[in-house]
UniProtKB/Swiss-Prot annotation:
Gene3D superfamilies: Rhodopsin 7-helix transmembrane proteins. The chain crosses the membrane at residues 45-65, 74-94, 114-134, 158-178, 221-241, 254-274, 288-308. The keyword Transmembrane applies. It is found in: Cell membrane. Belongs to the G-protein coupled receptor 1 family. It comes from Homo sapiens. This is Olfactory receptor 5AL1. It is a multi-pass membrane protein. Coiled coil: none annotated. GO terms for cellular component: plasma membrane. Residues 1-44, 95-113, 179-220, 275-287 are extracellular. Its main location: membrane.
Length: 329
């Protein structure tokens, strides 16, 4: 991390000074969601409650999976990592946003901004591929239940998760380094409530065509690749469910994928809205609204979606509560 800091600061300084005829920017100021002081206090309270709910929901789900032997399956192994990524995703933005709600000047250094961008992109990419891995897991469980243990062994699960984290960090690092090659001068005001690539590119005073093309290609590629895996998996699942003769069997097969399908629809919908679109049609104000939903709401909803619609999770939670009640008595 120190090496990354040194590279970013040195590269940013060298490139900005080389442009000349401009005052170099070393920190940024966020406009936030609103300039209304009373509304900012209200938003602080809302964001704090939602962030704490995200923490309790996601880490509660992780702990429940860890201490419940009946949940020690590939599906819940992936779900525990999705919960971790969800909370990390929110934590890359929410703490700084909460502080800014209470500050008159919402400033941040270039280094801190770069770290936030890198973490944000890393966890977005991780979530994309985790959702696609979970879709494949549901495909195997429904279409090839007898081969489930053979097709998705423990070692494969670990390799898939490790690959997701490594690839996500690589994409985040590449995008952050590419952003450091931009020159930021004169204006240092970012029209957003956190440091994202899109508003940063809009602020740059150097040529941004390469960076914009890179952002579009990488965002489009990762969204499309993961979405194709999801669509193919659910295509096979859909036809497999149609071949089930009993209504009860169809209902059981569908219920195992319903929560995951709900989560996918919400997440991909906001991602497609936010990133793979041309600059001329991109509204930063609309991006703020989508970002609040993507960064704050979805990571909080996911534990509820997977808990309330999943009988195995509800049964495991019920057993834990019963054990606690017996221990208290």
């Amino acid at each position: 991390m120190c090496a990354l800091k040194g590279f970013l600061e040195e590269n940013f300084y060298t490139y900005s000074v080389a442009k000349g005829n401009h005052s170099t920017v070393y920190e940024f100021i966020l406009l936030g969601l609103t300039d209304n002081a009373e509304l900012q206090v209200t938003l602080f309270g809302i964001f704090l409650v939602v962030y704490l709910a995200s923490f309790m929901g996601n880490f509660g789900l992780i702990m429940l999976i860890q201490i419940s032997p009946q949940l020690h399956t590939p599906m819940y192994f992936f779900l525990s990592h999705l919960a971790f990524v969800d909370f990390s995703f929110t934590s890359s933005v929410a703490p700084n946003t909460l502080v800014n709600f209470l500050c008159e000047v919402k400033s941040i250094t270039f280094y801190a901004c770069a770290i936030q961008v890198c973490c944000f992109i890393t966890f977005v990419v991780c979530e994309l591929y985790l959702l696609s891995i979970m879709a494949y897991d549901r495909y195997v469980a429904i279409c090839n239940p007898l081969l489930y243990v053979i097709l998705i062994p423990r070692k494969l699960c670990i390799k898939l998760i490790a690959s997701t984290y490594v690839y996500g960090f690589t994409v985040g690092l590449v995008q952050t380094v590419a952003t450091s090659y931009l020159s930021f001068c004169d204006s240092n005001v970012i029209n957003h409530f956190y440091h994202d690539d899109v508003p940063l590119v809009a602020l740059a005073c150097s040529d941004t065509h390469v960076k914009e093309l890179m952002l579009l290609i990488i965002a489009g590629f990762n969204t499309l690749c993961s979405l194709v895996i999801v669509l193919i998996s659910y295509g096979f699942i859909f036809f497999a469910i149609l071949r089930i003769h009993s209504a009860e069997g169809r209902q059981k097969a569908f219920s195992t994928s319903a929560s995951h399908l709900t989560s996918i629809t919400i997440f991909y919908g906001t991602i497609i809205f936010m990133y793979p679109q041309p600059k001329s049609s991109h509204s930063l104000n609309m991006d703020k609204v989508a970002s609040v939903f993507n960064v704050v709401v979805i990571p909080t909803l996911n534990p509820l979606i997977y808990s309330l619609r999943n009988q195995e999770v509800k049964n495991a939670l019920k057993r834990i509560i019963e054990k606690l009640c017996l221990a208290v008595k």
